[in-house]
């Protein structure tokens, strides 16, 4: 059965005023990748490119999305993997949809395409969002940097991670969008003061998840001596004990871990009072 494009039962929507895109075959040599918002090509990316090239079919090749820039070049918004694969196969031109937009809109388009299709990692989306000056991304970056840490816009291997590097982008974003940027700054500041051995593992999701969500439970927590809380009981010990309780009582790990830190923070507040 063949169906037409039928939308007569839906209310029409008027799109934003914008120039119509152009369709063309663009020389691969004129396509460039803007590292301000595009993801870098690591080993996994190159493996994917080689797989596309090894079984290249035009029937599977969606036109790349480009924006014209100075010098007669085209910034690649979406499709750098396909473009690289075509180059490996010796094709000098690729089909493209060309849209005239600013660099900020290029970055926003990258975020939209890769967020809706779930192809980019959270750090990669953050990188593009910062380039596009998206408010949420700037707020996330600033909340982390205010604590002397760095919100990472690309992944690293475990061996290459350093103390103060925060990869928990989704956690930070959720807290910031929930009005808890203060908790991100307070929690990370305490970790930096507590960590006198530059332990990268302290800034992993394993620790940051329960710790930052615990700090965020109450604005009063920011007034407590959070450094003393961390020094009073090793964070790993807190999490391990919480996991045992969760197993015995059949409770969710995330909630039990968070509540364990909440109890320690509140107890520190009572002692200080």
Predicted regions and their residues:
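Solvent-exposed functional surfaces
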Residues: 91-273
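Classical N-terminal secretory signal peptides
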Residues: 1-3, 272-273
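Short alpha-helix boundary/capping and kink motifs at helix termini
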Residues: 2-77, 81-88, 92, 97-100
């Amino acid at each position: 059965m063949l169906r037409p494009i039928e939308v007569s039962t839906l209310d029409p929507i008027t799109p934003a005023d914008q120039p119509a895109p152009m369709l063309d075959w663009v020389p691969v040599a004129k396509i460039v990748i803007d590292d301000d918002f595009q993801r870098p090509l690591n080993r996994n990316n190159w493996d994917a490119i080689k797989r596309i090239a090894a079984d290249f079919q035009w029937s599977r090749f969606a036109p790349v999305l480009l924006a014209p820039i100075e010098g007669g070049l085209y910034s690649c918004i979406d499709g750098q993997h396909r473009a690289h694969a075509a180059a490996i196969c010796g094709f000098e031109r690729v089909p493209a949809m060309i849209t005239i937009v600013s660099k900020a809109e290029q970055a926003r388009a990258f975020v939209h395409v890769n967020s809706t299709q779930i192809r980019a990692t959270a750090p990669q989306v953050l990188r593009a969002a910062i380039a596009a000056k998206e408010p949420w991304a700037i707020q996330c970056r600033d909340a982390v940097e205010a604590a002397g840490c760095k919100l990472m816009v690309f992944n690293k291997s475990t061996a290459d991670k350093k103390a103060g590097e925060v990869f928990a982008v989704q956690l930070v974003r959720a807290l910031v969008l929930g009005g808890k940027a203060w908790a991100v700054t307070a929690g990370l500041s305490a970790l930096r003061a507590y960590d006198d051995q530059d332990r990268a593992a302290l800034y992993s999701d394993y620790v940051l998840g329960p710790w930052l969500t615990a700090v965020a439970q109450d604005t009063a927590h920011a007034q407590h001596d959070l450094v003393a809380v961390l020094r009073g009981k090793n964070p790993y010990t807190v999490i391990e004990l919480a996991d045992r309780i969760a197993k015995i009582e059949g409770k969710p790990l995330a909630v039990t871990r968070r509540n364990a830190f909440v109890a320690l923070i509140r107890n520190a507040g009572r002692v200080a009072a």
